[in-house]
Amino acid sequence: AHRRWLCYSNPRLAALLDECIGTGYRKNPEELADFAKYADDSAVLERLRSIKHENKKDFSNFFSKRTGVSIDTHSVFDVQIKRLHEYKRQLLNVLNIIGIYLELCDDPNLDVRPRTYIFGAKAAPGYQMAKRIIQLICMLSREIEQTPGVRDKLKVVFLENYDVTTAEAL
């Protein structure tokens, strides 16, 4: 429910919402629509930006402790977490990343905003295609890390043993 994924997992944002619209949204999520009146409030928008960056730093620290891999907190996080199936677009996302990778290999000076693709998935034990897609994601991650001129602009990480604790960190 929204209380777990907003209030518990994102206490900074919950505190801002409490200040701006009160605590009623915690029981009645429809009240979150009241936050729209702050869409042009520069002070609130700056606090949102700061909250987002602090949360990215928290996740980066969590991920680094868990895997030893660091993530650029100034990069755009593109997150796709769900059970892996051929039809759930993970493969399409991987093919898009390969396209970006090839463009950056051709032109390392290409002006792109650094982006971190974060995958988390589980595959059913007998679902070989899903396991192969996970292998492809991991191979692409290693290839990007070994390519100078690309690794500073593009990163792919795979969250192994994805669970609720990891989801809450995200």
Report the location of each language-model feature:
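Catalytic cores of carbohydrate-active enzymes across secretory and cytosolic contexts
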Residues: A1-L170
